[in-house]
């Protein structure tokens, strides 16, 4: 079904038209005109009356004056309501069509409806044939841990026919796996008056279910069906039968769940009120002082009341939803929204039945009306969810509940929503944090609907937003013995009785309370991350669940990474200070602060720590609290947060202590922590440039445009640039664009203007050397300046150069100005990029996780062998910026790992063909401008590149400036989408498994070696390694790193690959890792490109004669051309299979975390013919050969 939903939305998007609409406050819904229309059905055209030809009078004038409306038929009421709803309720026709199309796709097929009716009728006949009897033995396993053997249980035939419950009853079944819930009521005679105590009711319920299941398996009607037991909502006290009918009619797409219930009159009224105790301490062998009141068991009581009140609640829901297509469709919309966010899973899940009851509640409160459209139903529910507080209690009770009683009821639960009977809390098992999360998601949905500049449909209904992608850190505890120890030593008896000794809610309560107190303002929410329990065959024993917990932490970016926890002063609050010391243990110390105060405090780091270290503060706090309070060793816990930060750390092969610099650098540093050093050096250089004396023109603006100035450079930049023989050697250069004051003396000829620009740069270099003692070298790209070990490339921007590039003279001698590739490139680099770079820098100041998220995204794309020529780096930065700008989640991203997961989701689920990614920096685009751009994008989609990204600084180039038809191409875009989906599968499997191990970075940040035809290996000693952490090559094992410094600005491999693509892209695709990759992978184009073709003078590139006047492109000839272009860099060509075979036969595999050991122990591998005669020793390794300067000059 999700696949169908995507398809339907795309179809609606293609057929819809964008229109302006205005939001309307829906608080006045009760004044809307009554109608039975659901708001989506298209109005039927009126039936035209047939007119005889003889009576038809032809019109003499088709252009009558406006006042003549005699022949214009007024719109019908249906049409008027349709138009009003479209104008008032929806963004546009597009949104309405998308919703309508999705609802049509969600409608249950008639064959399923017929099957459900027939199955229920058959099952009703079956239950009538059941007989009373003693259950002495059974070959099935009772799906519950019983305190006594199941002997002597007397089965009583049900006196009430089975009935549908849940979605099947309300007409809101949702695929792709259709689950039909059926209730079978135990007769009152099966229960005794004392069965309310000590799980007796639950055990009888399980036995009753087992007996019915056994009889069904004996029946011929169900002999071929699959029978399994499962726990409803991960609740071990709620076993249900899951039956999968084996029939061609439903083809295993339908499942029946059988619930066993009991009549409400089975026990005395008030027996299960929240303040009563129904599980005695003696049941678990505990002693209890008879003078103390027994603890309440409100959660267990609610568990029993779920069964007892099910019949009455379902009857009321049936009454409210029956024959109301608008309510049903509204609930379907809400269920899709809820499922996409995975808020309805597990013991603490916010189930769809709560939303169904809330719709009825709003209807009773006259907030929602029977005439409301399905869209109004969903919108009103979201709005009321966001703005009402259920912690104080709301009630659906037929007989009104007094406020005092409701408050008394609500005190026993985090969230309180009383059902129709006035006895059961529908939200009994929902923790406060999860309820708050539902409210935040609802509030976000309303905000998205109100945003007229956004098509909110895919964000609300289509995009999957699993809960793990909404959290910043994850805590896993899965050691069975440790959990038992925690529950035994630290779970309070009242909690134990309240949850009937079920471990999971006890763990959830214990950990949530501890972490909430310890993390305080650092954390926004602590959410349980659950997966549905797996069904098991009815012949097997019921599995033990609840001995594993996974919590997601949503952090507050403003406070999460503070290095200090400050406690009360010992003099002012001795008791508070003592409690602070007790809570934090040995971590707490008495400290004096600059304001003179002396208080207890806990210090987790220093203000000078790197951002990566500060992001680990929450981890340190959580692990300390678990160890100090629960005696849980850190080895028994997995705290996931920041594991992927390793990929942009400094390579351990490079030793920082050998670097001559005044900076205090740590060996464990990373690209993020090194960026501020470069920015400070740039700021000082900018001040020196502004302060230069005796320049002919004043420098009016200086802009850093390299990624490092916006914290987006994934490779660590160290102060290691050198001046050697009037040449600057540097691994990276930082680009700076300067603009001068106005002058009318610049030449009007392009080459002369560029010569004058070069002369001006030379003069700036001389002034820098004379006044600031900085070394400089002029190059073809600009002025290279060496400062504090960093190399800056200064470029001079001038408006006249841009105008001269656009200038064209027609045949008639008329001068025109036309955009071309060269002018667009210059305009982007010198005028637009500085503005965008400043905006991205500001974005990083607002969201500290932005820069590091970009680092992860860029490293991932690079390790997938996608360089800037296949996927522009700026496209990555802008897509990540789009994530942080748009409201995809209620809270902003606080951890880069979470940002990276959302980036993968963006790549996986976006409709690149239909979506234009807009970045409205500083809100400088008006709504009308955005609407016009989007309209032009949809109308002329073929004129835009496959990936269209636009910023508010792009002017007339919006959508075409940062990407092109070939970068990324449609094929590359599809390839990246598939890679992102696979990466998400790996991450999700790891995060949601009970295994403590998280994915190793190499699992994500190393490309597959499958699918490539050839691999060209470069000479390792001629290609410098990247300073970033090396995760290995997909083709060859690790080799000795090479950190030699190349000539500044000379990225030879990138230039060679660019030449190969420009010359041979019709015959092959080229892939390499721009971050130090030493292999070039090749994929040949389809064989049709290499077929013989007629001789044509214009199509002879790479061709060889093939006879009969034809020519043909030969792969062997192409390979020789590749070798010629690569020159001295070429080592050899091999297939991936040959490389894999060599690794298996000749080399021991080495993992990335063995790198440090390998440095000390590695020796050159002996070659077959490298042994000295008469000895078994290998010949000494050859010295590294430096590439000759003549070869370098040839590549300039």
From Swiss-Prot:
Residue ranges that the Swiss-Prot or TrEMBL entry lists as coiled coil: none
A molecular function GO annotation: RNA binding
Keywords: Chromosome, Nucleus, RNA-binding
Segments of skewed composition (Basic and acidic residues): 22-31, 65-74
Main location (coarse class): nucleus
Matching InterPro entries: NOL6/Upt22, Nrap_D1, Nrap_D2, Nrap_D3, Nrap_D4, Nrap_D5, Nrap_D6
Compositional bias ranges of the Basic residues kind: 1165-1187
Region listing for Disordered, in residue ranges: 1-74, 1140-1196
Tree of life domain: Eukaryota
Annotated GO CC locations: condensed nuclear chromosome; CURI complex; small-subunit processome; UTP-C complex
Cellular location(s): Nucleus, Nucleolus; Chromosome
PANTHER family cross-referenced by the UniProt entry: NUCLEOLAR PROTEIN 6, NUCLEOLAR RNA-ASSOCIATED PROTEIN
Role description: Part of the small subunit (SSU) processome, first precursor of the small eukaryotic ribosomal subunit. During the assembly of the SSU processome in the nucleolus, many ribosome biogenesis factors, an RNA chaperone and ribosomal proteins associate with the nascent pre-rRNA and work in concert to generate RNA folding, modifications, rearrangements and cleavage as well as targeted degradation of pre-ribosomal RNA by the RNA exosome.
Family: Belongs to the NRAP family.
Protein name per its UniProtKB record: Nucleolar protein 6
Organism phylogeny: Eukaryota, Metazoa, Ecdysozoa, Arthropoda, Hexapoda
């Amino acid at each position: 079904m999700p696949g169908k939903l995507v398809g339907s939305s795309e179809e609606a998007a293609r057929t819809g038209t964008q229109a302006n609409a205005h939001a309307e406050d829906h608080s006045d819904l009760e004044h809307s005109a009554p109608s039975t229309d659901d708001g989506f059905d298209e109005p039927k055209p009126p039936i035209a009356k047939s007119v005889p030809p003889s009576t038809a009078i032809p019109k003499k004038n088709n252009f009558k004056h406006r006042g003549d409306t005699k022949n214009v038929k007024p719109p019908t009421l249906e049409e008027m309501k349709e138009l009003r709803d479209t104008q008032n309720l929806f963004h546009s026709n597009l949104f309405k069509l998308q919703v309508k199309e999705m609802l049509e796709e969600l409608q249950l097929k008639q064959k399923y409806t017929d099957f459900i009716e027939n199955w229920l009728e058959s099952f009703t006949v079956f239950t009538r044939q059941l007989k009373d009897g003693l259950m002495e033995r059974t070959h099935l396993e009772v799906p519950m841990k019983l305190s006594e053997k199941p002997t002597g249980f007397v089965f009583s035939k049900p006196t009430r026919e089975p009935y549908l419950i849940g979605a099947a009853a309300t007409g809101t079944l949702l695929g792709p796996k259709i689950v039909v819930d059926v209730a079978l009521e135990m007769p009152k005679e099966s229960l005794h008056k004392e069965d309310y105590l000590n799980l007796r009711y639950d055990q009888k319920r399980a036995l009753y279910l087992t007996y019915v299941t056994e009889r069904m398996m004996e029946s011929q009607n169900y002999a071929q069906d699959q029978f399994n037991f499962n726990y409803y909502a991960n609740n071990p006290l709620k076993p249900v039968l899951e039956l999968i009918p084996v029939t061609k009619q439903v083809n295993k797409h339908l499942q029946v769940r059988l619930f066993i219930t009991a009549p409400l009159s089975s026990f005395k009224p008030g027996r299960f009120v929240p303040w009563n105790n129904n599980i005695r301490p003696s049941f678990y062998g505990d002693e209890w002082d008879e003078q103390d009141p027994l603890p309440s068991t409100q959660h267990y009581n609610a568990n029993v009341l779920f069964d007892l009140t099910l019949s009455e609640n379902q009857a009321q829901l049936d009454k409210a939803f029956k024959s109301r297509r608008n309510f049903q469709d509204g609930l379907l919309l809400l269920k899709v929204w809820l499922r996409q966010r995975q808020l309805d899973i597990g013991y603490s899940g916010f189930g769809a039945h709560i939303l169904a009851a809330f719709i009825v509640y709003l209807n009773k409160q006259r907030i929602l009306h029977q005439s409301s459209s399905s869209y109004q139903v969903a919108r009103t529910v979201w709005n009321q969810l966001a703005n009402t507080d259920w912690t104080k209690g709301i009630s659906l009770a037929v007989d009104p509940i007094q406020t005092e009683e409701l408050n008394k009821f609500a005190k026993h639960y985090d969230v309180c929503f009383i059902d129709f009977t006035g006895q059961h809390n529908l939200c009994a098992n929902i923790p406060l944090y999860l309820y708050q999360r539902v409210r935040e998601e609802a509030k976000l949905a309303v905000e998205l609907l109100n945003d007229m500049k956004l098509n909110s449909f895919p964000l609300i209904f289509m995009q999957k937003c699993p809960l793990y992608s909404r959290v910043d850190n994850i805590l896993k505890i899965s050691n069975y013995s440790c959990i038992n120890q925690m529950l035994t030593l630290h779970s309070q008896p009242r909690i134990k009785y309240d949850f009937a000794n079920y471990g999971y809610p006890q763990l959830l309560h214990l950990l949530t309370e501890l972490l909430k107190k310890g993390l305080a303002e650092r954390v926004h929410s602590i959410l349980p991350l659950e997966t549905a329990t797996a069904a098991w065959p009815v012949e097997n024993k019921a599995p033990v669940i609840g001995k594993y917990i996974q919590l997601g932490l949503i952090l507050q970016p403003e406070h999460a990474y503070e290095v200090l926890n400050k406690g009360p002063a010992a003099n002012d609050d001795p008791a508070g200070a003592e409690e602070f010391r007790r809570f934090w243990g040995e971590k707490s110390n008495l400290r004096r602060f600059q304001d003179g105060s002396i208080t207890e405090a806990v210090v987790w780091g220093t203000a000078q720590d790197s951002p990566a270290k500060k992001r680990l503060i929450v981890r340190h706090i959580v692990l300390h609290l678990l160890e100090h309070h629960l005696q849980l060793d850190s080895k028994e816990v997995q705290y996931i947060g920041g594991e992927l930060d390793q990929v942009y750390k400094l390579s351990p092969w490079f030793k920082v202590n050998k670097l001559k610099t005044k900076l205090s650098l740590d060996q464990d540093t990373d690209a993020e922590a090194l960026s501020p050093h470069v920015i400070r050096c740039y700021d000082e250089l900018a001040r020196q440039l502004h302060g230069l004396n005796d320049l002919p023109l004043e420098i009016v603006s200086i802009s850093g445009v390299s990624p490092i100035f916006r914290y987006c450079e994934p490779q660590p930049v160290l102060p290691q640039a050198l001046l050697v023989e009037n040449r600057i050697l540097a691994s990276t250069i930082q680009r700076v664009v300067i603009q001068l004051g106005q002058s009318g003396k610049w030449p009007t000829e392009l080459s002369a203007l560029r010569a004058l620009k070069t002369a001006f740069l030379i003069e700036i270099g001389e002034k820098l050397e004379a006044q600031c003692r900085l070394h400089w070298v002029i190059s073809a790209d600009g002025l290279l300046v060496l400062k504090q070990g960093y190399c800056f490339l200064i470029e001079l921007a001038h408006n006249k150069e841009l105008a001269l590039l656009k200038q064209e003279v027609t045949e008639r001698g008329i001068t025109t100005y036309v955009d071309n590739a060269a002018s667009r490139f210059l305009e982007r680099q010198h005028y637009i990029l500085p503005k965008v770079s400043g905006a991205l820098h500001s974005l990083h100041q607002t969201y500290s996780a932005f820069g590091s998220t970009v680092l992860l995204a860029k490293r991932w794309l690079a390790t997938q062998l996608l360089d800037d020529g296949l996927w522009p780096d700026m496209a990555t930065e802008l897509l990540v910026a789009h994530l942080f700008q748009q409201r995809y989640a209620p809270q902003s991203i606080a951890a880069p790992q979470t940002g990276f997961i959302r980036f993968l989701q963006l790549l996986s689920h976006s409709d690149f063909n239909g979506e234009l990614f807009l970045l409205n920096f500083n809100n400088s685009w008006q709504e009308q401008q955005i609407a016009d751009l989007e309209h032009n994008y949809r109308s002329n989609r073929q004129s835009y590149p496959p990936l269209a990204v636009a910023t508010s600084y792009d002017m007339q180039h919006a959508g075409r400036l940062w990407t092109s038809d070939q970068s990324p191409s449609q094929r590359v875009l599809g390839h990246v989408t598939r890679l992102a989906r696979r990466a998400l599968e790996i991450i999700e499997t790891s995060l949601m498994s009970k295994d403590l191990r998280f994915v190793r970075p190499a699992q994500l940040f190393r490309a597959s070696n499958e699918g490539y035809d050839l691999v060209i290996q470069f000479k390792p000693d001629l290609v410098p390694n990247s300073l970033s952490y090396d995760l290995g090559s997909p083709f060859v094992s690790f080799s000795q790193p090479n950190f030699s410094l190349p000539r500044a600005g000379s990225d030879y491999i990138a230039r060679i690959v660019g030449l190969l693509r420009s010359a041979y892209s019709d015959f092959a695709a080229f892939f390499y890792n721009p971050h130090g990759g030493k292999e070039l992978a090749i994929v040949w184009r389809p064989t049709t490109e290499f077929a013989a073709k007629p001789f044509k003078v214009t199509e002879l590139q790479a061709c060889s004669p093939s006879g009969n006047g034809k020519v043909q492109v030969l792969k062997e000839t192409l390979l020789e051309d590749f070798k010629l272009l690569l020159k001295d860099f070429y080592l050899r060509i091999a297939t991936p299979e040959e490389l894999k075979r060599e690794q298996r036969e000749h080399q021991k595999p080495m993992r990335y975390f063995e790198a440090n050991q390998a440095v000390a122990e590695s020796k050159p591998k002996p070659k077959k013919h490298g042994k000295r005669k008469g000895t078994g020793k290998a010949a000494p390794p050859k010295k590294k050969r430096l590439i000759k300067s003549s070869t370098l000059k040839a590549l300039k």
